From Swiss-Prot:
GO cellular component entries: mitochondrial inner membrane
GO biological process, one term: mitochondrial respiratory chain complex I assembly
Segments passing through the bilayer: 3-23, 59-79, 93-115, 150-170, 178-198, 200-220, 240-260, 274-294, 326-346
Organism: Elephas maximus
Keyword presence, DNA repair: no
Taxonomic classification: Eukaryota, Metazoa, Chordata, Craniata, Vertebrata
Keyword Transcription regulation: no
UniProt signal peptide: none
Family the entry assigns: Belongs to the complex I subunit 2 family.
Annotated keywords: Electron transport, Membrane, Mitochondrion, Mitochondrion inner membrane, NAD, Respiratory chain, Translocase, Transmembrane, Transmembrane helix, Transport, Ubiquinone
Protein name as annotated: NADH-ubiquinone oxidoreductase chain 2
Molecular function terms from GO: NADH dehydrogenase (ubiquinone) activity
Entry membrane topology: Multi-pass membrane protein
Reaction(s) the record says it catalyses: a ubiquinone + NADH + 5 H(+)(in) = a ubiquinol + NAD(+) + 4 H(+)(out)
Amino acid sequence: MNPLALSLILTTLFTGTLITMMSSHWLTAWMGLEMNMLTMIPILMKTTNPRSTEAATKYFMTQATASMMLMMALTINLMYSGQWSITKMTNPVASNVALMALMTKLGSAPFHFWVPEVTQGVELTPGMILLTWQKLAPLSLLYQMATYTNTNLIYLSGLLSILIGGWGGLNQTQLRKILAYSSISHMGWMLIILPFNPTLTLLNLAIYILLTLSIFMILANTFTTSMSSLTLMWNKTPAMTIMLMTTLLSLGGLPPLSGFTPKWLMIHELTKNNSIIMPLTMAIMTLLNMYFYTRLIYYSSLTILPSTNNMKMTWQFTNTKHTMMLPTLITLSNMLLPLTPMISMLE
């Protein structure tokens, strides 16, 4: 892609997200979402082939449908309340339709079907943007709407997302699809805690983005996209294999790594609000995710194929210009748990 065109696209993507996050008026927020959607399409089609074209088409049709639903909800709310303010979504029908539209944009269940297909059809870098940056704008709107949303609908979507995110990833061999189902599962945790403590939703989002960025950068640097290619990682890049192993354990929420922090705080918040069954169900369903993370670790770190000494030395001569951010990301991905008391004090 032309560097000038790419810089313009990325600037527009950043601006669209920023407009939505800073908006208190529904019309400007909707405009930011549309900028975000339209600039994401050429990013998905960075390499022109039938699979990326199909993925971009699916993304466009799903997001356009969600945008129409959102505009319909805004119109209904305007008719009944005369308000364009995001925090004044008082009409229950408009609130429910807007909630479903934003859930579709986020890719949470039962509106999740486009996420694995689109992620699998594109390269690792567009997939990384899709599963990280594209969550910011819709979730910022849900954060502002938290007071007026239908909590039962949020709980249902959250529990379904955790279940489907774990269940769907069990039988996958493609890493992009596994990370897509992981994204759906994490989105379920964020949605469930939203009515109780929106700040914890933002904390979970920040740590999820940090972990997902780390994994995608490791996979991009080792040119790994499937489980079969994971088995060669230890022979080629042992250092990155160890990084991948610890980051996957952190993504699964295993103590004492960073990914345990939001799960610990969210379960504590739910039990503090006399909700016992829900956090127990969430923790049990998350074991499905832990299973396929462990399977990835087994293939990458615990299975070593026969190799020659020449093959073992290749990791010393690989191009390292794209790995400058990795040490910082990996450190943050694995060592934030000691800061948990400070985070609790800030709530």
